[in-house]
Amino acid sequence: MAQPGKILKEQKYDRQLRLWGDHGQEALESAHVCLINATATGTEILKNLVLPGIGSFTIIDGNLVSGEDAGNNFFLQKSSIGKNRAQAAMEFLQELNSDVSGSFVEESPENLLDNDPSFFCRFTIVVATQLLESTLLRLADVLWNSQIPLLICRTYGLVGYMRIIIKEHPVIESHPDNALEDLRLDKPFPELREHLQSYDLDHMEKKDHSHTPWIVIIAKYLAQWYNETNGRIPKSYKEKEDFRDLIRQGILKNENGAPEDEENFEEAIKNVNTALNTTQIPSSIEDIFNDDRCINITKQTPTFWILARALKEFVAKEGQGNLPVRGTIPDMIADSNKYIKLQNVYREKAKKDAAAVGNHVAKLLQSVGQAPESISEKELKLLCSNSAFLRVVRCRSLAEEYGLDTVNKDEIISSMDNPDNEIVLYLMLRAVDRFHKQHGRYPGVSNYQVEEDIGKLKSCLTGFLQEYGLSVMVKDDYVHEFCRYGAAEPHTIAAFLGGAAAQEVIKIITKQFVIFNNTYIYSGMSQTSATFQL
């Protein structure tokens, strides 16, 4: 019998459990997130992590709540003015979910980096908002060397900016959109071939004929097609139309010679493209197999790469060039008995393949002196059912992005083919940071400074472009606009960015879905966004 607490939790988190499952929720509840600066953007991010039940969070902020903070931050009130910003925000955020533990550190990140940089290495992930460039570079370096993920978030006027910094992020459950079914009709495994041979469409009662699964129907007519075309699978549009006609001819006729209403045959005709999907290993999986980390297994090799290597060995041996069978089939018109039998054929093959991969895993673990049980059966099943969708994301460090010799000029210059591309906003953010470094403030923070700062900001932009050897032109309109922003943090933009950033944090923690690589820019002016590898 299920425990009452567990039932309540399932009810509370029902919708998200459908997205990332029990194991994803467990990862979320075990995570400790660090937020640097309780700004409007920062508290919006935490709000979207506290509500789904993040384990715990710590806010680092040495600032006191100002009137401006209370005006643009939903989690700070007039009564908060004068209090430490981290403490005030933490108290309000904790009210959202009693399952979540919150804490705060009343100190600036600069002081912590000076006195105790290892402090940041205790967290699952660090989220930094509205930090100065110099502080970001120091923080990013500490976390990069400790392999702690860092998400930089910034709201600047009508611009939203995010940067993910993570050395390597492997994903087993990438949840691709419109994933193709794994039916293997072009390369039927022996158990499937034997099951298909048990059907004889030409000598069936009408009831059985109209309740035969469409997978069986397509397989039967595919065998007939092979006989007529020397084993060539239908590929072109015309060939697939001819194949559909061949299936259509198999629909039973009534006593008047008119076709019967057989929905399963119509379903088969609609699913020709799905069924004739070629069984092959995606190039992205081949890249993983050829990666040095997959080839060279040691005692320190992470679980993902041991699983990937076992998968590679399965493909070379038992799989005969193919990945493990996924073991699922779509819903279809069929009687329960026929559907379940067909479903079991795929399920049993999937179990058999998973067991074979498991044997390779055990041998690999033993070869590097690790216990065979150190990788669970659950992890093994997840790998096999998602073997076609594995992903590895590797981001560049912030030091590489900012380095004169390592800056990704090609990405910036090619994006500037369109003078209004979102990459312009990135260039402007770099320019305002240079402005701050030179003048100790951001451009246009006071109304009387807007006009006089236009020339100064343009000079900073020109200097930045020249220093990095970027032969691109930025419209003056953008310089004027960024001066008018005055480094403001509008709550509408902060709220949007908070939702987007929390989504990426959850992806990193649960290791499900695919994070962007590595920079995301949102334009509130044009309501568009783009990602770049910088």
From Swiss-Prot:
Ubl conjugation found in the keyword field: yes
UniProt-annotated location(s): Cell membrane
Primary localisation category: membrane
InterPro entries to which the protein is assigned, alphabetical: APP-BP1, ThiF/MoeB/HesA, ThiF_NAD_FAD-bd, Ubiquitin-activating_enz
Full protein name: NEDD8-activating enzyme E1 regulatory subunit
Modified residues (N6-acetyllysine): K6, K341
UniProt-annotated site: Interaction with UBA3, residues: H211
Pfam families in alphabetical order: ThiF
Region of interest called Interaction with UBA3, as start-end residue ranges on this chain: 331-344
SUPFAM superfamilies found in the cross-reference section: Activating enzymes of the ubiquitin-like proteins
